[in-house]
Amino acid sequence: MTQQLNVDPAEIKKFEDMASRWWDLEGEFKPLHQINPLRLNYVLENANGLFGKKVLDVGCGGGILAESMAKQGADVIGLDMGKEPLTVARLHALETGTKLEYVQSTAEQHAEENPETYDVVTCMEMLEHVPDPLSVIRSCAKMVKPGGHVFFSTLNRNIKSYLFAIVGAEQLLKLVPKGTHDHNKFIRPSELLKMLDQTALQERGITGLHYNPLTDTYSLGKNVDVNYIVHTTL
């Protein structure tokens, strides 16, 4: 009996259709380019650097975070189920001379083949796009080495996140395409922590990611009402 993949075909198609514009700094993925230095620095600071470490980026898309981690001297594999985003990621790595590998697979499949393999696992802006986020979290826990670091980022589910991420970002400011997110799939920090409790991962810190529409800039802070990042260790 074939195991059902933890994949939403509609989500895959959504990002396949936008793949060619992944590295357009003024396109649909501009917010990802803007927040990437913050995400990268958060990982660097909490994982004590990445140089020489084996790193997996789950749900890597077109490779924005994966490529930036490779440039820090990490041995990076980017994992995604979208064929077109991975094609774009590979081409961009060739253009920039960045050495890393991209694999088309689910977290679950990769975990079966690569247990306790990585020093650092990142899973950013991905959990809200799969049918079973707990399954992805369990897979990340399985793939990291004992003592290793796993980072998750997603969106909180409340009225404020609906107003900011759906009404504001998608409908008014048009920071991302309409339909990019489904508010019902957003994950409260308390829910994410309960999922972590079902694994061996230990939460080490949580921080919010904030957008200032007046300055068109992002920053990290204590408020986790909308976007947030969680640092865990095994």
Curated annotation (Swiss-Prot):
Keyword Protease tagged: no
Alphabetically ordered keywords of this record: Methyltransferase, S-adenosyl-L-methionine, Transferase, Ubiquinone biosynthesis
Transcription regulation in keyword set: no
GO biological process, one term: methylation
Positions contributing to S-adenosyl-L-methionine binding: R39, G59, D80, M124
Organism, scientific name: Aliivibrio fischeri (strain ATCC 700601 / ES114)
Gene: ubiG
Family membership: Belongs to the methyltransferase superfamily. UbiG/COQ3 family.
Protein name: Ubiquinone biosynthesis O-methyltransferase
Pfam families registered for this protein in UniProt: Methyltransf_23
EC code(s) of this entry: 2.1.1.222, 2.1.1.64
Catalytic activity as recorded in UniProt: a 3-demethylubiquinol + S-adenosyl-L-methionine = a ubiquinol + S-adenosyl-L-homocysteine + H(+); a 3-(all-trans-polyprenyl)benzene-1,2-diol + S-adenosyl-L-methionine = a 2-methoxy-6-(all-trans-polyprenyl)phenol + S-adenosyl-L-homocysteine + H(+)
Broad class of enzyme this protein falls into: transferase
Functional description taken from the UniProt entry: O-methyltransferase that catalyzes the 2 O-methylation steps in the ubiquinone biosynthetic pathway.
Biochemical pathway: Cofactor biosynthesis; ubiquinone biosynthesis
GO molecular function: 2-polyprenyl-6-hydroxyphenol methylase activity; 3-demethylubiquinol 3-O-methyltransferase activity; polyprenyldihydroxybenzoate methyltransferase activity
